[in-house]
């Protein structure tokens, strides 16, 4: 792109006045030296000059500037526009796909509640009652998580457990046992056992579920589920008093591959069959 004909150059400063002759001399002595390297060396040499050595060039630069102002009274320095830099990439270590945030807000409003609990007091999203009572805040967070990851029935149970645990002095302990009960009931989901072998959801909370089962048995109704001996992927509701002792034999899980027969060791002990 050619420059316009009426382009007015800036007046030279003291360094430009001094380097004009020095650049020509250095280029003749080093014909293969790049212009950027010449400028770098000239700048270093200019800094080494004393004030008395720079004075003649400073005066010459002032004279040229005064002459430039007389010739071009309306001159205004307009720097060249630099090309716009590319937009910075997302600051997040794990970028969220486009449109995922809106889908999550529409399908799972509980995510907003969970985000509000973790936003802190500075954001103004957490009620003062939850800030004053951490047990209620933990119960509300657990209920919000249950609404997202569990079906409606399990979500209702989680909400009831959270409400009951909020008024108890041992709310955090009770909340853990109630969540264990919810996890055992959620094992009936279609994605819980798609390969035909038992899930590990109930076993992970074995100790906590025993206490929850005993409390629920006194009130009556369904307390927990047992895996069916005939079909390991099917959970049978049970209202027995408690789970078998963990010291007898922990529940086992087997993966049946093509070409393999039934395992010799029964993965479910006789205590499960007796409890049915």
From Swiss-Prot:
Coiled coil, from the record: none
UniProt key word Nucleus: yes
Biological process terms in GO annotation: hair cycle; hair follicle development; positive regulation of transcription by RNA polymerase II; regulation of DNA-templated transcription; skin development; stem cell differentiation
SMART domains per UniProt: HMG (SM00398)
Annotated keywords: Activator, DNA-binding, Nucleus, Transcription, Transcription regulation
The UniProt record lists the keyword RNA-binding: no
Main location per the UniProt record: nucleus
Molecular functions per Gene Ontology: DNA binding; DNA-binding transcription activator activity, RNA polymerase II-specific; DNA-binding transcription factor activity; RNA polymerase II cis-regulatory region sequence-specific DNA binding
Entry's localization field: Nucleus
Phenotype upon gene inactivation: Expression of ameloblastin AMBN is significantly reduced in the tooth germ of postnatal day 1 (P1) molars, but ASCL5/AmeloD expression is not altered.
UniProt xrefs under InterPro entries: HMG_box_dom (IPR009071), HMG_box_dom_sf (IPR036910), SOX_fam (IPR022097), SRY-related_HMG-box_TF-like (IPR050140)
Single GO cellular component term: nucleus
DNA-binding region range list: 8-76
Purpose of the protein: May play a role as an activator of transcription of OPRM1. Overexpression of SOX21 can up-regulate the OPRM1 distal promoter activity in mor-expressing neuronal cells. May play a role in ameloblast differentiation.
Name this polypeptide is given: Transcription factor SOX-21
């Amino acid at each position: 792109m050619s420059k316009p004909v009426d382009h007015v150059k800036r007046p030279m400063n003291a360094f430009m006045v001094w380097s004009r002759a020095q650049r020509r001399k250095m280029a003749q002595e080093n014909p293969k030296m790049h212009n950027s390297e010449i400028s770098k060396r000239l700048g270093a040499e200019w800094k080494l000059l004393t004030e008395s050595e720079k004075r003649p060039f400073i005066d010459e630069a002032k004279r040229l500037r005064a002459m430039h102002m007389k010739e071009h009274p309306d001159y205004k320095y307009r720097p060249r526009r630099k090309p716009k830099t590319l937009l910075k990439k997302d600051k997040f270590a794990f970028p969220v796909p486009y449109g995922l945030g809106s889908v999550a807000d529409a399908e799972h409003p509980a995510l907003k509640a969970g985000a509000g609990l973790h936003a802190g007091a500075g954001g103004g999203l957490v009620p003062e009652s939850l800030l004053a009572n951490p047990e209620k805040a933990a119960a509300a967070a657990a209920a919000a998580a249950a609404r997202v990851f569990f079906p409606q029935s399990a979500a209702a149970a989680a909400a009831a457990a959270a409400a009951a645990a909020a008024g108890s002095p041992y709310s955090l302990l009770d909340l853990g046992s109630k969540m264990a009960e919810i996890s055992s009931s959620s094992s009936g989901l279609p994605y819980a056992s798609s390969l035909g072998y038992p899930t590990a959801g109930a076993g992970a909370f074995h100790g906590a579920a025993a206490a929850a089962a005993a409390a629920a048995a006194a009130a009556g109704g369904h307390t927990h589920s047992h895996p069916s001996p005939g079909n390991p992927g099917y959970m049978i509701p049970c209202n027995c008093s408690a789970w078998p002792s963990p010291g007898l034999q922990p529940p086992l899980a087997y993966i049946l591959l093509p070409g393999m027969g039934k395992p010799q060791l029964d993965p479910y002990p006789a205590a499960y069959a007796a409890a049915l």
